[in-house]
């Protein structure tokens, strides 16, 4: 199991909230998050309640202040929810599709891909089926830009999920010992 502690001030000061599972509304415990300590496991933190908005991946470590987190690539300054990423040690496998509802060109993916356009000759893809493992998708090649967490399941339409103007350009397996 994982454990993440949110503090309302920088440098682990002020009130705190200990979390060992998913939390859809951190603001019911703290009015703001100034620093974070991940004692064990891996977590996705979200800009809005109910796991919505921009996301950022956190592994075990200390995050002293939001300014430092923003310099690491986090593009938002509020954290309202978090999701624990369960430990996983199996194989990784997913299928990506050119169109909604698993239509069009399909590719099976089992490892990291730093540039989907170059490797698969796909400028865009609109649905996927994650069969095994936990993955991070990025909006730019080489694991840059905004990121999204995908766990096993069927994702029939990125547009219906609120990603209508989003193009995923790289993907990485979450292989950390979470």
UniProtKB/Swiss-Prot annotation:
One example of a Gene Ontology biological process annotation: visual perception
Protein species of origin: Cyprinus carpio (Common carp)
UniProt subunit comment: Monomer.
Disulfide bonding pattern of the chain: none
Role of this protein: Crystallins are the dominant structural components of the vertebrate eye lens.
UniProt entry keywords in alphabetical sequence: Eye lens protein, Repeat
Domain of life: Eukaryota
Protein family per UniProt: Belongs to the beta/gamma-crystallin family.
Protein name per the record: Gamma-crystallin M1
Domain comment in the entry: Has a two-domain beta-structure, folded into four very similar Greek key motifs.
Domain spans labelled Beta/gamma crystallin 'Greek key': 2-40, 41-86, 92-132, 133-175
Gene Ontology molecular function, alphabetical: structural constituent of eye lens
Region of interest (Connecting peptide), residue spans: 87-91
């Amino acid at each position: 199991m994982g454990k993440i502690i949110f503090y309302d001030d920088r440098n682990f000061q002020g009130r705190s909230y200990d979390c060992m599972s998913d939390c859809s509304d951190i603001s019911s415990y703290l009015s703001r998050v100034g620093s974070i300590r991940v004692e064990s496991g891996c977590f996705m933190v979200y800009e809005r309640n109910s796991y919505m908005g921009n996301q950022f991946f956190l592994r075990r470590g200390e995050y002293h202040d939001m300014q430092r987190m923003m310099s690491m690539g986090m593009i938002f300054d509020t954290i309202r929810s978090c999701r624990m990423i369960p430990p996983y040690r199996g194989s990784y496998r997913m299928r990506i599709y050119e169109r909604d509802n698993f239509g069009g060109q399909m590719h099976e993916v089992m490892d990291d891909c730093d540039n989907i356009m170059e490797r698969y000759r796909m400028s865009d893809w609109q649905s996927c089926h994650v069969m095994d493992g936990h993955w991070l998708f990025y909006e730019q090649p080489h694991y840059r830009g905004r990121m999204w967490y995908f766990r096993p399941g069927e994702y029939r339409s990125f547009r219906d999920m609120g990603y209508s103007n989003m193009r995923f350009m790289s993907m990485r397996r979450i292989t950390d010992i979470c």
